From Swiss-Prot:
This is DNA replication licensing factor REC. Residues 796-805 have a biased composition (Polar residues). GO terms for cellular component: MCM complex; nucleus. Residues 36-76, 796-818 are annotated as: Disordered. It comes from Drosophila melanogaster. The lineage of its organism: Eukaryota, Metazoa, Ecdysozoa, Arthropoda, Hexapoda. Pfam families: MCM (PF00493), MCM_lid (PF17855), MCM_OB (PF17207), WHD_MCM8 (PF25051). Required for meiotic DNA recombination in females. Probably not involved in DNA repair and recombination in somatic cells.
């Protein structure tokens, strides 16, 4: 028993507080943070009135108070939350959902049965602003039954909400004029209002359906499932905010709505957790919901109703809508923007983590281009379990509220962009201007640049049809610069450098990353899927991943073998690659496969193959002047100069003026060339000279990469050209002549088929896109024929006059038939015999000659064929004699 107070009211040493020997006062419950003792009672909330005030909340009386405690109205009540605001820095922006609620009493009003699903603390007041807005949104949903399927929304648990429809409703605009601003600045509260209105409409629709039908009652013979309660419904807003750049997102705009566009580079493993658990009091039958965190599952220790004194026997409700099992997934989105140009060697596009919940989980796949709308949040880097970062810094992330596939969403161009595109198209030779603007530091090589430009424009089906280009040449010729320039101006590009060895090889296919190897990471082939372009520098050094590349080009998918499972991902990229010769310098006397380390099957997948050689020519003086001007800063990539006037273009193709074709505006049926009946392959048409910059023209005002990127994106998006009758006849004549030129070799002619015909058509359509033309003319086909002819000529041996080609010339010289191989082998053998002065050769010597002739497999069968044909005579064991002519 404590002694009584002494006279005068002086505190005794036995009394708590700052008395004699008692030390500093500490409450019964406290905790520490950063070395400071924080009382569990906390401070009075800013919105809490003084004791005795009219608006002061009433504190329910405690059932049992510990001895010596006198809880007043000013102290923290039973359901009051902790306030640690004094620990926050001065510039702290309180999040909208920062008020943590540990438990709630499910006391929904009669008008809204799902009120506590969306508003945990706010009480319903009839006639206030929130109630009026909810009723107005309900009326909007009921006025548009053709837009909202209430039965499907109840089953799915979410509904798409288009901004165009709800913003244009006049009745809703009168009640809620600031809807657009509220959903942008206060998205959580606004989306909760929109979702609660839909929840109420769905509940009323379900009640109407139950009243109209005869309710079945369970019997001992037949059990009838009870009608489940409607769970929480989520609104998925679309087009409420414009798409913004990830780099422009500021931390000061936390808890506001953002929209970004990009490619899904990483997909994490979904995690499941119980976030809320509903209980029912066994005495008063009141429903209580408690927040669940971690592995420990708390239970109510007292009833939320002040009249009830129950402290135990709370029954968990598994089927209650307030019992929520939350699904969470983290993905990483890489930015896709036409206003940014990245140098893949030194910088990478901006990335942002996105948190998916509920129905949005597993809604995307790696490599998919999406538009994500979400709420900006902050998190500690140390809390990220998908990566190994252990920093104390804060990074922004998006809490997604809606996700859409960006393949069907067109890109928007400003008025300034459209004016620049018109200026480029108004040039009399826009093809030449665009070709010269690609890698201007590389002098010459106009045809390889033109081939890369057509590959970036794609064919008719730009999402599924690819145009693959391979550049082979001596080191230092400028192949890497061309590839880097193509990666910068590609609308959807990925760059892989083979100089990094195994690290680059792992960037091709789909791999697992993260600390626990639970994050699915998209490779370059997946990031360039869907009409994108993957540039591979030194593809011959990626020997370990050439099988992955071949499979992607052939089957248009990337496989991922797993333990006990097998996964495949669709991938349709266009590949622009380069390779160096094995011996350091390209040998024109050897086949293409003997110069580079690429398999024949992979080589056949390239439609265009060009050999870039450093030969002495009359251009060397111009090359010297070009290099000097480049280092002096004279050839800088400037924007379109003032001389680009908005003038009408005289022709749809830059070749029509030089070919004496009637100007645009006349009937297309009258466009006929005087040599239509002659062979197209025999016409004297030098495309390389037409794309070359002449000395009298001076320096061109080259286009910047960002403008080329927008021009190519506009052409791919808005134009889908078709072949007219003249262009179709030109393609057919060239294809028949290409097939007829290989009639002497049956094996080669059998490889010229529909694939090569489709390649010519897709290249012609890409050439028409470059002129912003909706019709493919014969002049467009002529440019494509010039590119194909040059590719076939460069990749064939100088000694052979026949065009040995496969898919558009890509496998030229690499897949010759047995008869062609036999002719080349016998020709080299006779030359070797004449040089040595003898006709007897051993088998190893003949094999070496066959290797020089490009015969890598089946040499024994070839020697046997020569023996049976009488070209070689067997003179003993592994000894053969060359029969002279």
């Amino acid at each position: 028993m404590n002694p009584t107070l002494s006279r005068g009211g002086a505190p005794s040493r036995f009394v708590r507080g700052r008395g004699r020997g008692g030390g500093a006062y500490r409450p019964y419950f406290y905790f520490r943070r950063n070395g400071r003792v924080i009382p569990a009672g906390g401070n009075r909330q800013p919105n809490q009135g003084e004791p005795g005030a009219p608006d002061a909340p009433s504190v329910p009386p405690a059932t049992r108070q510990p001895r010596g405690w006198s809880r007043t109205a000013g102290k923290r009540g039973r359901n009051a939350h902790l306030d640690c605001s004094f620990l926050r820095p001065e510039n702290y922006a309180a999040p909208e959902d920062g008020l943590q609620v540990q438990s709630i009493a499910v006391d929904n009003p009669r008008a809204y049965s799902g009120w506590r699903l969306y508003f945990l603390r706010e009480k319903y007041e009839e006639g206030n602003e929130l109630a009026t807005r909810i009723m107005a949104v309900e009326a909007y949903y009921q006025r548009n039954p053709h837009t909202f399927d209430f039965v499907m929304i109840r089953d799915r648990g979410f509904f798409p909400l288009c901004a165009a429809g709800i913003k244009s409703d006049a009745q809703l605009k009168e009640v809620w004029p600031s809807l657009s601003e509220d959903i942008r600045e206060h998205p959580l509260r606004t989306l909760g209002t929109l979702s609660l209105a839909m929840h109420t409409v769905v509940v009323n629709h379900q009640l109407d359906c139950n009243d109209s039908t005869t309710a079945m009652v369970s019997t001992p013979e037949q059990y009838v499932l009870p009608t489940p309660r409607v769970r929480k419904i989520y609104a998925r807003p679309d087009d409420f905010v414009p798409v913004e750049s990830i780099e422009g997102i500021s931390h000061s705009r936390v808890d506001t709505l953002f929209s970004i566009r990009g490619f899904v580079s990483n997909v994490g493993e979904p995690s499941y957790s119980l976030t809320w658990q509903a209980f029912r009091c066994s005495r008063c039958q009141m429903e209580i919901a408690m927040r669940q965190r971690g592995t420990f599952q708390p239970r109510p220790y007292q009833c939320k109703r002040s009249e009830c004194v129950a402290r135990d026997e709370f029954v968990p409700l598994r089927s209650s809508p307030y019992t929520r099992l939350s699904i969470r997934q983290i993905i990483r989105v890489e930015e896709s923007s036409l206003n940014l140009v990245h140098d893949f060697e030194t910088s990478m596009p901006a990335e942002m983590d996105v948190e998916l919940r509920h129905d949005l989980v597993d809604a995307v796949r790696v490599g998919q281009e999406v538009v994500v709308t979400g709420i900006l949040k902050l998190q500690e880097l140390g809390d990220d379990t998908t990566t190994g970062d252990t920093s104390n810094q804060m990074q922004p992330y998006l809490k997604a509220v809606s996700i859409r596939d960006a393949s069907s969403i067109k890109r928007e161009f400003s008025e300034r962009d459209l004016e620049a595109i018109v200026m480029i198209n108004a040039e009399p030779n826009s093809f030449k201007l665009l070709v010269q603007s690609i890698a201007p530091e590389v002098y010459g090589h106009e045809l390889p640049k033109a081939a890369c430009l057509l590959s970036l424009l794609g064919g008719k089906g730009a999402e599924t049809e690819a145009i693959n280009v391979l550049l082979v040449g001596d080191p230092g010729i400028g192949k890497t610069k061309i590839l880097q320039s193509c990666a910068q101006i590609a609308e959807r590009g990925a760059h892989v450098s083979g100089k990094r060895g195994a690290q680059s090889a792992q960037q091709l296919g789909v791999t697992f990353a993260g600390r626990n190897k639970r994050v699915l990471q998209a490779g370059s082939l997946m990031m360039a899927s869907g009409g994108g372009h993957c540039t591979l520098d030194d593809v011959d050094k990626l020997a370990s991943k050439q099988a992955v590349l071949l499979q992607c080009l052939q089957s248009e998918e990337v496989n991922l073998p797993l333990a006990g499972a097998f996964a495949s991902f669709p991938a349709q990229p266009s590949v622009i690659a380069c390779a160096n010769p094995q011996r350091g310098q390209y040998d024109e006397g050897r086949y293409l496969l003997q110069n580079i380390n690429i398999s024949p099957s992979l080589l056949r997948e390239f439609h265009l193959v060009y050999i870039l050689l450093d030969k002495p020519s009359e251009r060397d003086m111009s090359l010297t002047a070009h290099v000097r001007a480049l280092h002096a800063g004279a050839r800088k990539r400037a924007r379109i100069a003032a001389r680009y006037a908005l003038k009408p273009k005289m022709s749809d193709s830059m070749c029509e003026v030089s070919l004496n074709v009637p100007a645009a505006g006349k009937d297309d049926d009258t466009i006929k060339t005087e040599d239509d009946n002659d062979s197209i392959m025999q016409q004297d048409y030098d495309l390389d000279k037409r794309l070359e910059v002449l000395p009298e023209e001076g320096d061109l005002d080259l286009l910047p990469p960002i403008l080329i990127k927008k021009f190519l994106s506009y052409a791919r998006q808005e134009l889908n050209p078709v072949l007219n009758e003249d262009a179709s006849n030109a393609v057919l004549r060239y294809f028949l002549e290409l097939k007829g030129s290989c009639n002497l070799d049956e094996d080669v002619s059998s490889q010229i088929g529909a694939g090569q015909l489709l390649a010519i058509i897709h290249l012609s359509q890409a050439r028409a896109r470059l002129d912003l033309s909706h019709v493919v003319s014969p002049q467009h086909v002529r440019d494509v024929i010039a590119l194909l002819t040059e590719s076939i000529t460069q990749t064939s041996l100088k000694e052979g006059s026949s065009r040995q080609g496969t898919r558009g010339g890509g496998g030229a010289g690499g897949g010759a038939g047995k008869s062609a191989q036999l002719r080349n082998f016998l020709e080299l053998t006779k030359r070797r015999s004449a040089a040595l002065g003898r006709r007897i050769f051993e088998f190893d010597e003949l094999k070496e000659i066959g290797t020089r002739a490009g015969i890598l497999t089946g040499f024994s069968q070839l020697v046997e064929m020569a023996n049976l044909g009488g070209y070689l005579l067997m003179k003993g064991a592994n000894m053969y004699e060359v029969v002279p002519d």
